Curated annotation (Swiss-Prot):
Residues 8-171 form the Exonuclease domain. One of its GO terms (biological process) is DNA metabolic process. Belongs to the oligoribonuclease family. Its main location: cytoplasm. 3'-to-5' exoribonuclease specific for small oligoribonucleotides. It comes from the Bacteria. This is Oligoribonuclease.
Length: 184
């Protein structure tokens, strides 16, 4: 393990919906990579307990997806609070990346950051203010070089750790096929 300012923090949250004012976080995972996107460590993958009442408010898509992938059952069986998950995640990150240097990395990370600001503010504050959002490259590729999109397919399990791994692989794909850089 090596604390390095060039390391990148990848994060994904699964939530009961998209509005942080009325929805909650139900899963969090993190991965740390080096600047070349090589995975250095996987952080804790944590299902966060939410009440049956909270889970019952999920829309049909969320309920179907999170039931089929087993997350609803994990959330019901979990006793972990959002604060406890935040602290475990911070303990992991502090071993790899100093505070305030890594952008938040992933797909559509501004959505994750909205939930972090609301429910895990100390973790939200750990990131640099910049974002490394893979979905930006996807949007640009769809407009400037749409054929590139055909070469990368996601499984879309909507489990946090799987989603992060796919985001890292997707960025590596765009690095080579859209930006035309080879890994050093």
């Amino acid at each position: 393990m090596q604390l390095d300012k060039q390391n990148l923090i990848w994060i994904d949250l699964e939530m009961t919906g998209l509005d942080p004012e009325s929805e909650r976080i139900i899963e969090i995972a993190t991965i740390v990579t080096d600047k070349h996107l090589n995975i250095l460590a996987e952080g804790p993958v944590l299902a966060i307990h939410q009440s049956d009442e909270c889970l019952a408010k999920m829309n049909d898509w969320c309920m179907k997806t999170h039931t089929e992938n087993g997350l609803v059952e994990r959330v019901k069986n979990s006793r972990l609070t959002e604060r406890a998950a935040e602290l475990q995640t911070l303990d992991f990150l502090k071993k790899w990346v100093p505070k305030g240097v890594s952008p938040i990395c992933g797909n559509s990370v501004s959505q994750d950051k909205r939930f972090l600001f609301k429910y895990m503010p100390e973790l939200a504050d750990y990131f640099h203010y910049r974002h490394l959002d893979v979905s930006t490259l996807k949007e640009l590729a769809s407009r400037w070089k749409p054929d590139v999109l055909k070469g990368f397919t996601k499984k879309n399990t909507h489990l946090a750790l799987d989603d992060i791994r796919e985001s890292i692989a997707e960025l590596a794909y765009y690095r080579e096929h859209f930006i035309n850089l080879k890994n050093e």
